[in-house]
A protein has these predicted regions:
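Glycine-rich phosphate/pyrophosphate-binding beta-alpha loops
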Residues: 56-67, 108-110, 139-140
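A sequence-level detector of short, solvent-exposed, charge-rich linear segments
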Residues: 35, 43, 71-74, 94, ...
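Gly/Ser/Thr-rich active-site loops/lids in small-molecule metabolic enzymes
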Residues: 5-18, 61-81, 117-133, 176
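Peripheral (often C-terminal) accessory segments that flank ATP-dependent C-N-forming ligase machineries
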Residues: 81-178
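Alpha-helical context
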Residues: 4, 19-21, 51, 55, ...
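Internal nucleotide-binding/catalytic subdomain
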Residues: 1-64
Length: 178
C-alpha cells in the first residue's frame, strides 16, 4: 500500500464521490440507518471507471498505515470530530512526502503457515529514519518476539517519493529475519 496514488485526480475523486460514496450515504439514510464513523471503500479503477469492491466500517489494513504515517493532523481530533458530527469543520493536514507499507507475511500465508517462529532485527529496522514497524501477527514470549499470524509485520517508510519510500522500506525489511 502506498500514498499518494498517482491515479487520484480531481475528476476521479468527483466520480467516486458522486457515483459510489454519496449514493451509499443517501441509501443508508433512506433505509433509516444513517452512518457516522470510519467507512473504508475498497475501490478498483478500471477502463470503465471506478468500481466498488467492498466497504468496511473500519480502516483498511495495510492501507491505513501509510495514510496515518502521512497524516500531520492529530488522528484523535479527526475521530472525535467524526463522532461529534463536525468533521466538515476540520481540515486534515498531510505531509507532502510519500509513504509505502510492505507487509511481511508468514511463509505459506494465506494458506497454512508456521507460528511461533522467532523474529529478529525489528529494532534495527525501526531505527532507520522514516521507518515505522507496525506489529500485526506477533507476540512476546520469554523475551522473544514471535510470529503468531499470517500478516506478521507492516514496515512503513516515508520519503520524498514513492520510489524512495519503497527503497527505504525494503532496506528496513532486509534487517528483519525470521
Amino acid at each position: 500500500a502506498f500514498t499518494p496514488t498517482p491515479l487520484l485526480n480531481d475528476t476521479l475523486a468527483k466520480e467516486v464521490m458522486e457515483h459510489i460514496i454519496e449514493p451509499t450515504i443517501k441509501g443508508l439514510i433512506a433505509d433509516g440507518t444513517p452512518y457516522q464513523g470510519v467507512l473504508y471503500a475498497g475501490l478498483m479503477v478500471t477502463e470503465e471507471g471506478p468500481k466498488l469492491i467492498e466497504y468496511n466500517c473500519r480502516f483498511g489494513d495495510p492501507e491505513c498505515q501509510p495514510l496515518m504515517t502521512r497524516l500531520e493532523t492529530d488522528a484523535l481530533e479527526l475521530l472525535l470530530a467524526t463522532a461529534e458530527g463536525r468533521l466538515d469543520k476540520v481540515k486534515p493536514k498531510w505531509s507532502k512526502h510519500a509513504a509505502l507499507t510492505v507487509v511481511m507475511a508468514a511463509k505459506g500465508y494465506p494458506g497454512s503457515y508456521e507460528k511461533g517462529t522467532e523474529i529478529k532485527g525489528v529494532e534495527e529496522a525501526a531505527a532507520i529514519d522514516g521507518i515505522t514497524v507496525f506489529h500485526a501477527g506477533t507476540r512476546r514470549e520469554n523475551g522473544k518476539l514471535l510470529a503468531q499470524g499470517g500478516r506478521v509485520l507492516n514496515v512503513t517508510a516515508m520519503a520524498p517519493s514513492v520510489k524512495e519510500a519503497q527503497e527505504k522500506a525494503y532496506v528496513a525489511v532486509s534487517k528483519i529475519d525470521w
